[in-house]
């Protein structure tokens, strides 16, 4: 029987879910409680604590049929740079629709996920950090400023949650400094990506992507195409023409990830981290460091899209919005 398009992608993702790198001892392993229909899911959640006072909080979300173990290497990079990182593992299959990606209607679950970031000091997010820290309760206060980073289908989830904060939680929305999308992928069903980005487009919230070329594992660039079509901005990120879908995972990818989606390219892994660390620093500080944005632009009134190159990653292709 021949399988094409989404069916092949689902098969590949299900195979990927069978293996994941184990958590290492230098993270703070824990759980997070998320309401799901009439029940509560208790999901694995890793925290990565910086050595000093956190510069901000990062929610780092894995992709379809992956787990937080596949984000461990990237999470440590961000923690080493001074950020407190929250990395939960979310289901990709659930009979009640409580899934990372949309397989029917997962919006109720994503609404519950957004509530984690509502700012409740006695909420599930604070409880998860406190439990993970154990005796080190002096560091349990959550930073009030945060950035969401999502890989693959995790990018759609962070887009949706950001839009939900904008619509329902104004105090929490004020603390959201930006979104970073890593080779984003739209769900096979529904329009969560387009609805979220349409809501966010006019807000001025920084939203940038690091994408690879179209492939089976990124649903042929569906999330990147949606971003470029929906955001009315001259610059929405970059594409690495030699990129693979696992570049974001780096050393936390695995054999099946490498076989099905391509092994991470060391040069691209390094460039992705250089660029996203630069963007993170700018998002939290409210600055624009020239090294991480297009220079040598040839924009005119007739051709307003960003062009040129980015000094920190000169080989990257600059992606304009609409």
Where are these regions (language model features)?
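Secretory targeting and sorting signals
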Residues: 1-25
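N-terminal cap/lid segment of alpha/beta-hydrolase-fold proteins
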Residues: 25-53
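Short beta-strand element of the alpha/beta-hydrolase
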Residues: 54-63
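Short amphipathic alpha-helix adjacent to the substrate-entry channel of hydrolases
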Residues: 69-88
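The feature captures the conserved acid-bearing segment of alpha/beta-hydrolase catalytic domains
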Residues: 171-245
